[in-house]
Each structure stands twice: as structure tokens, then as C-alpha cells.
Curated annotation (Swiss-Prot):
Belongs to the actin family. It comes from Dictyostelium discoideum (Social amoeba). Its EC number is 3.6.4.-. GO terms for biological process: cell morphogenesis; phagocytosis; plasma membrane repair; response to cAMP. The lineage of its organism: Eukaryota, Amoebozoa, Evosea, Eumycetozoa, Dictyostelia. InterPro entries: Actin, Actin/actin-like_CS, Actin_CS, ATPase_NBD. Its main location: cytoplasm. It catalyses: ATP + H2O = ADP + phosphate + H(+). PANTHER family: ACTIN (PTHR11937). This is Putative actin-22.
Amino acid sequence: MDGEDVQALVIDNGSGMCKAGFAGDDAPRAVFPSIVGRPRHTGVMVGMGQKDSYVGDEAQSKRGILTLKYPIEHGIVTNWDDMEKIWHHTFYNELRVAPEEHPVLLTEAPLNPKANREKMTQIMFETFNTPAMYVAIQAVLSLYASGRTTGIVMDSGDGVSHTVPIYEGYALPHAILRLDLAGRDLTDYMMKILTERGYSFTTTAEREIVRDIKEKLAYVALDFEAEMQTAASSSSLEKSYELPDGQVITIGNERFRCPEALFQPSFLGMESAGIHETTFNSIMKCDVDIRKDLYGNVVLSGGTTMFPGIADRMNKELTSLAPSTMKIKIVAPPERKYSVWIGGSILASLSTFQQMWISKEEYDESGPSIVHRKCF
């Protein structure tokens, strides 16, 4: 398998969005929702060529008549048939490539079950006949994209958040922490607090509207209590949003109450530590000699870190947890929504990486378990 003459494909399969493209590019060619939609009603118009399932943007645009399902929950694939549909759509409709002609780099969340990664490997080789593949840890790729080899990555996507400390290019597995609280939980929480305002959003299609409200209007308050006071005493924080049917709704303190759950998971009835505390705990699990380097390189990555104000708040919270003399730096690259993909693009085009691929021959010889030996 000679990686020089053929471009590798990089696919970052997120719980919410799938990012796909070619190694060496600076941005993914295709970004679409990781959704498979099936009609809620039976078709009556014969000859319209109705399909029994829709993927990605097409599912999103027809959401009014479909039931939408996400095959990846909390970073783990829960429905392999739908996952196969998403990959098929990625190769043939989005990238328009033959998977049997390109090595494929896939990504996954750290601390995923081993079976998840084996099944990914099996489908790539047996269903799509790829010549070679590799599975990389998402947070590690984000660090590559930021041009660092040491730092702690706080990666928060739609399905899962995790903190991964990396020193001189090595991830420290004993200190990786995972938090099953991410964008989708915030969307559900936003649905709940909007219901308290008298706006009802219940179906899977309406959840997508709420996700849009969250992405466009939500932000993280630097001081939550003070912000609540401001919201109560004036209408300066209120914003309006036009629903697809033209109805206009107003949202106020929901704008910052929603992402506040990242710092106070008790809002969602969860007992876990918030993202700031999880980052701190992760640093504390590392050797005392390297903590300073980690505090000075806290890299945010993933779509759920895109809320305005999140970096300042993270800085404030970590400063109060860390030793008083510690220099803390939060790195929030503007392209952090795609930094996992960008890191994958960098990794797959390195000449030193070419011997890391799992080839079809190796797979045929050892079976799916080879992935644990060849990929971190």
C-alpha cells in the first residue's frame, strides 16, 4: 500500500455532524448532520421515487415528514446499519470517491468500547473494501491542529465531552476523563426551559429548530448569578427568533442558562463535575512535573465550545481551582469546530504516518482486533 500517489480520506464521525474530506486539505469538503431519517407516513404518490431512508442534509430538509435518528450517541455507534448508510452517503454522494481506492482515517472518542472500534474496522474492510484504514483519537487530532505536542484538550461535541492530557505527543490514558454531557444534552435542556416559557417543542424535527436557536443565540455568562439579575431587571439580553412558520419567539435568560449546564451539570440532574472541574481533575491525575505545561495549554475543541464567552469563563474557573501563582492559558482557535478533522488531515498527510496504516493484508491476517495493536 503506497500512500504517496493516492489521497487519503479523513472522516470525523461526530455524534451530531459528520466532517469528511481529503488529507492535505485545510478544511473538510463535506459537513452534514449524522442523521438518518425515515418517513413517518406511507407514500401515496406513485412514481415519485420516494426512498425508505434519507441521510444528512436531505433528511434535514424533509424533516417535517420524517422521524430523525442519530446512529451515534455519546460518541458510540448504537446503530450500525444506519452508520453504514452514513458512510455510504459520505463516499458516494458527498466526496464522490470509490472507497476501495483510498486509505481512510476515522476518528473516535477516547474510552470508547473496544467493540466499537473493531466493528468500524470490519465494516471499512469488508463492506467498503478500503485498501487501508486507521482510527485516531479525536482530542489528539485537535492538538495536532493547534500546532502543539503538549497540552490538555477539552473536546466537547454533540454527544460526548472529554479531557485528554497530552505530553510530547503522548496521550496519558490514565488521566483521560470523559463526560457524557455535550451539545445534544444542551439542546434537550433548551427544549425543556423553552417549554417553561410556553413554547412547545417535542418532535425530533422540532429539536433541530431548538438546536439552531441554541447555536445562534446562546452564550456563556462570566458570572451566572449577576447575569440572572441583569436578565430579571431589564430586557437588554432578550433576543427574538423567527420560527420556520413565521412566528417570532423571544428568549431571555435561556440564552445563558442553557450552556451554564456545562459548568453546572446539576441543572440537568447530573451529579458529575462541570467541564472546568473535569479539566482540573484531569490535570491533577498527571505527574506533578508536567502540570504547569498543561495549565498553560488548555485547548478547546468541538462545536460545543463555540459559545461566545466560554474561554473567559473557563479561564476564570480554572484560575480559582489552580494554585494562585499558576499561569493559565485557554486556547480557543476560531476553527475549533473542525479542528479534529483538520488534525486528521495533517496526520494522514505526514510521511512518517504512512507506515501506521492498517492494510487490508494485515486485516485479513489478524482480523478486527488488529486495530487495538496498531492504533492508540
